[in-house]
Regions:
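Glycine-rich phosphate/adenosyl-contacting loop at the front of the ribokinase-like
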Residues: 1-63, 68-72, 79, 97
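Ribokinase/PfkB-type carbohydrate-kinase core domain
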Residues: 2-14, 76-89, 101-150
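Beta-strand->loop->alpha-helix junctions that form or flank phosphate-binding loops
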Residues: 61-66, 84-94
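Short, well-ordered alpha-helical microsegments
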Residues: 70, 95, 146-148
Length: 150
């Protein structure tokens, strides 16, 4: 069990996956009626939620959008008992994966908007000593800009 205030600190990205599914046969160059799902994602966000589900009370160092969708991501993490006090909410703070699936459920196309993780460096410069001295361990996303971790 975690003994320090910040428990396991997870550092990395938040993504929101936007997935579209057609009601009928998918027409790539036409209009397709269907339904769209918004799913909170990102490897680090997923990992911190999984750690919280084990009741280890982790801390997340990440960036969310300063939008209703970003607020929803933070609220969901808080409901899972993730410490979000060091998260920042900024414009375009989250990554987005837009995916369209065909009528068989296979991926027909996608676009990924990568988040700017440099503001995590600001969090570490402002609160890094406090975060690290009050944690049990740190999990860092590997796909992070080198400047954020050096």
């Amino acid at each position: 069990m975690a003994v320090n205030k910040n428990g396991i600190v997870v550092l990395g990205a938040v993504f929101v996956d936007i997935k579209g599914f057609p009601e009928d046969i998918y027409v790539p160059d036409g209009r397709n009626a269907g339904h769209v799902e918004y799913i909170h994602g990102g490897v680090s966000r997923n990992v911190v939620e999984d750690i919280a589900n084990l009741e280890l009370r982790p801390t997340f160092l990440g960036i969310a959008d300063n939008t209703a969708l970003g607020e929803d991501v933070v609220r969901k993490l808080q409901r899972h008992k993730v410490n979000t006090e060091y998260m920042k909410e900024i414009p375009n703070g989250m990554g987005t994966w837009l995916a369209v699936f065909d009528h068989n459920g296979d991926l027909a196309g996608s676009i990924s908007q990568r988040p700017n993780l440099m503001p995590i460096l600001d969090i570490l410069e402002e609160n890094g000593d406090e975060i690290i001295e009050n944690c049990d361990s740190i999990v860092a996303e590997i796909d992070i800009d080198r400047k954020s971790v050096v």
